[in-house]
Amino acid sequence: MKSKKSKFSGSIGFVLAAAGSAVGVGNIWRFPYLCAKDGGGLFLLIYLILVLTFGFTLLTTDVAIGRKTKQNALNAYATLHEKWRFLGYLTFLVPTLIMTYYSVIGGWILKYLSVYVVSNGHEAAQDNYFTSFITSKVSPIVFMLVFLAFTAWIVYRGVEHGIEKFSKIIMPGLTLLIIFIAIFSLTLSHEGSDGTVRTGLQGLAIYLRPDFTGLTFKRFLEILLDAMSQLFFSLSVSMGIM
């Protein structure tokens, strides 16, 4: 008897799962850092241009290949033509390499989540807490294994009952969390040792205002490469995910 393929039950599940893949630590942590480092609005403009051109093309191609072949990332390219089989292995290799450090970061997140649930975050706010945690011989490994086990369990349940179901639960909560972080950051103020007060709105201005100071052709290429690498993280393209 032919087994039924696991698939999304509707478009909402696919959109939420795709958004969950995009809105990860690569965007929450890496994007603001690159934006501040690479000229604020200048980086943002280059990134948006790449997303609307190069990124859109890659994303639609990824989705089209998946819909056409109805195969996993390993076999999709071979279904199109046998000579492209090696591309399937390359797309499988990328998330495998990413998982080596995402699993560690996932363990950190679980650790902090457990601390905030148990002690309202007071313990995690102490000086050198993070350093003492990551230098521990046992604790980081335990939380990493818990994260990997939980992830494997979701994947084992399949697309509809695993990835789609948990995306519908987690993504609304993540959206509210991001909104809360944004509001908190914009209303934040800090007084330095010299008496200078810095606010979240000043940080937003740095984030959005283009800074052309020291811009050369070499520097522009560096910003372009940073924006391109961020695009792959944001859209999860060419990684066997879409």
Regions found by a protein language model. Name each.
Residues 16-22, 48-53, 90-101, 146-153, ...:
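Hydrophobic alpha-helical transmembrane segments of multi-pass membrane proteins
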Residues 10-48, 240-242:
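Transmembrane helix-boundary motif of multi-pass solute transporters/channels
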Residues 2-6, 34-38, 71-90, 103-162, ...:
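Inter-helical loop and helix-membrane interface segments of multi-pass membrane transporters/permeases
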Residues 26, 51-63, 67, 73-74, ...:
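Central hydrophobic cores of alpha-helical transmembrane segments in multi-pass inner-membrane proteins
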Residues 49, 53, 57, 169-190, ...:
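Selective recognition of specific alpha-helical transmembrane segments in multi-pass small-molecule
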Residues 40-47, 82-100, 164-175:
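Alpha-helical transmembrane segments and their helix-start/interface "positive-inside/aromatic belt" motifs
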Residues 6, 35-61, 139-140:
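Extracellular loop-to-transmembrane helix junctions
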Residues 1-29, 58-63, 67-79, 83-89:
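Membrane-interface "cap" regions at the ends of multi-pass membrane proteins
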